[in-house]
């Protein structure tokens, strides 16, 4: 039997089975370790990841099953991710739904898929880059719980940081 055609069954948060090529699943260090420890006969539980997110992540793993994406240069030199990564990766992570993006970050971290975690975090960084605190709050729907006096005090205490970036 061809090693590349061995299938593994992943069990999502909703207890739904997703069948995938072993080599694709092994892009996750967590799954790779589980396969090495227990084999591929039993379902592999992925209790922290919804089926929808797991399918999206497996799409990424399928694309990169035969390669390792290059490191994303840090700090980011632009807020245009397509200038920093492969066009497929830029399109893949161009997610409008921030909740889904954060679920991918959590799942990539849990599954130990460093290249996807870096990509998703870089996407978040592009949403923050060159924005004011008010713009960042608006983007991420974060309430401002500082009084104007507290904000003024914080700005004064951190004036050196603003001067360093000007």
UniProtKB/Swiss-Prot annotation:
Secretion signal, residue range per the UniProt entry: none
Gene3D superfamilies referenced in this protein's UniProt entry, alphabetically: Potassium Channel Kv1.1, Chain A
Cysteines paired by S-S bonds: none
Keyword check for Ion transport: no
Phenotype reported upon loss of the gene: Increased telomere length.
GO BP annotations, alphabetical order: protein ubiquitination; ubiquitin-dependent protein catabolic process
Pathway of action: Protein modification; protein ubiquitination
Keywords assigned: Ubl conjugation pathway
Keyword Nucleus applies: no
Source superkingdom: Eukaryota
Region (Interaction with the F-box domain of F-box proteins): 105-166
Family note: Belongs to the SKP1 family.
Protein task: Essential component of the SCF (SKP1-CUL1-F-box protein) ubiquitin ligase complex, which mediates the ubiquitination of proteins involved in cell cycle progression, signal transduction and transcription. In the SCF complex, serves as an adapter that links the F-box protein to CUL1. The functional specificity of the SCF complex depends on the F-box protein as substrate recognition component. Its association with the holoenzyme telomerase ribonucleoprotein complex suggests that it may play a role in turnover of holoenzyme telomerase complex components.
Protein name: S-phase kinase-associated protein 1 homolog
Native organism: Tetrahymena thermophila (strain SB210)
């Amino acid at each position: 039997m061809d090693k590349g055609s061995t299938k593994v069954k992943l069990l999502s948060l909703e207890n739904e089975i997703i069948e995938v090529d072993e080599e694709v699943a092994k892009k996750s260090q967590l799954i790779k370790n589980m396969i090495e420890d227990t084999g591929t006969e039993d379902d592999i539980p992925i209790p922290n990841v919804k089926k929808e997110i797991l399918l999206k992540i497996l799409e990424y793993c399928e694309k990169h099953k035969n390669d390792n994406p290059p490191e994303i240069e840090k700090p980011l030199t632009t807020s245009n991710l397509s200038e920093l990564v492969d066009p497929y990766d830029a399109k893949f992570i161009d997610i409008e739904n921030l909740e889904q993006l954060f679920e991918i970050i959590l799942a990539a971290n849990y599954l130990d898929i460093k290249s996807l975690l870096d990509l998703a975090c870089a996407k978040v960084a592009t949403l923050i880059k060159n924005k004011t605190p008010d713009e960042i709050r608006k983007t991420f729907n974060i309430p401002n719980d500082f009084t104007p006096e507290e904000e003024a005090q914080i700005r004064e205490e951190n004036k050196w940081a603003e001067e360093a970036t000007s």
